[in-house]
Design a protein with these regions (language model features):
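Core catalytic alpha/beta fold that binds nucleotide/phospho-ligands
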Residues: 1-140
Length: 140
């Protein structure tokens, strides 16, 4: 396994919370139905949603592209039964990853009361159960 790309992104929670409150449709544009549903399980979903947004941005950086290269719904953060975050990558994002030689992903999410952060590593070969292949979700 070798690293194809690395992306890191951080989101300021107060700012993200204001954007979500000011623009009602933004959550629908940024997150899949499952991501939004996951957020509603918590009294304040801001940190968890912001970490998922950071992961989408970090995935773009890991692929060496910017906003507009693919839609936000084409990179989704799902949870393995263990709770481990996993990237599900589909559509144009999966095709771009395939062309870049990405065979799997590593993702780490964290948040405090002020900042959410994600680190995404695109790797050349997948390992079953620990990362998602470029066009799907890891099985565990």
């Amino acid at each position: 396994m070798s690293v194809v790309g690395l992306g890191v992104d951080a989101v300021e929670l107060d700012r993200f919370r204001r954007v979500l409150a000011r623009t009602p449709g933004v959550a629908r544009r940024l997150f899949t139905e499952d991501e939004r549903a996951y957020g509603t399980r918590f009294r304040d979903p801001t940190g968890r949603l912001a970490a998922r947004f950071a992961a989408k941005e970090a995935a773009m950086k890991a692929l060496g592209v910017g906003l507009g290269a693919f839609g936000f719904h084409e990179v989704e953060v799902v949870r393995a039964p263990s709770g481990q975050p996993i990237l599900r990558v589909v559509g144009a994002a999966a095709e771009l990853a395939r062309r870049r030689g990405v065979g799997g992903w590593r993702v780490s999410l964290t948040h405090t009361d002020r900042v959410a952060q994600a680190v995404v590593v695109a790797v050349s070969e997948g390992q079953e159960g620990s990362e998602a292949p470029a066009g799907g979700e890891a099985r565990s």
